[in-house]
Design a protein with these regions (language model features):
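Short S/T/G/P-rich N-terminal loop/turn motif that feeds into the first structured element of a domain
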Residues: 1-140
Length: 140
């Protein structure tokens, strides 16, 4: 078959605060679509609230984290053939240094994150998780 390259624009991100001492980790993807009342501006505002929560969690823990996220906007039409993600406007990409830190972060988020307010995007509820090994270290 033909090799196909799918490229994305990274429109928004939160960098890691510290480098992961051991390569590899866990990545997760949420695939989301904008709605009539939730567009790119609302996404940036929602990420601002998420960043505030992350800052408070890091401060409470007293240690920096290698967790980071990026918002990937496809430079191609979705869905792609054979994809289970369906059609989407952006992929919310998370990186954790381990499954343990991902599970701890998810539990903390479930317990302490502010409830969503106002319009929300249409997202696939299932988080697509993969083991990861970076080709290069993210810049800090």
């Amino acid at each position: 078959g033909d090799a196909i390259n799918y490229s994305f624009n990274v429109s928004n991100f939160r960098p890691a605060q510290t480098q992961d001492p051991e390569p590899g980790g866990v990545v997760g993807f949420n695939f989301c679509s904008y709605t009539d009342s939730f567009g790119p501006g609302e996404l940036i505002a929602a990420n601002g609230i998420y960043n505030q929560w992350l800052d408070a969690a890091v401060e409470a823990a007293g240690t920096e984290t290698p967790y980071f996220y990026t918002i990937h906007e496809p430079n191609f039409e979705t869905p792609i053939p054979g994809s289970s993600a369906g059609s989407y406007d952006y992929a919310f990409h998370h990186f954790w240094d381990s499954e343990e830190s991902r599970a701890q972060g998810a539990a903390l988020f479930a317990e302490t994150a502010p409830a969503p307010q106002g319009p929300q995007p249409d997202c696939i509820q299932e988080l697509f998780l993969f083991d990861s090994y970076p080709f290069r270290s993210p810049q800090i």
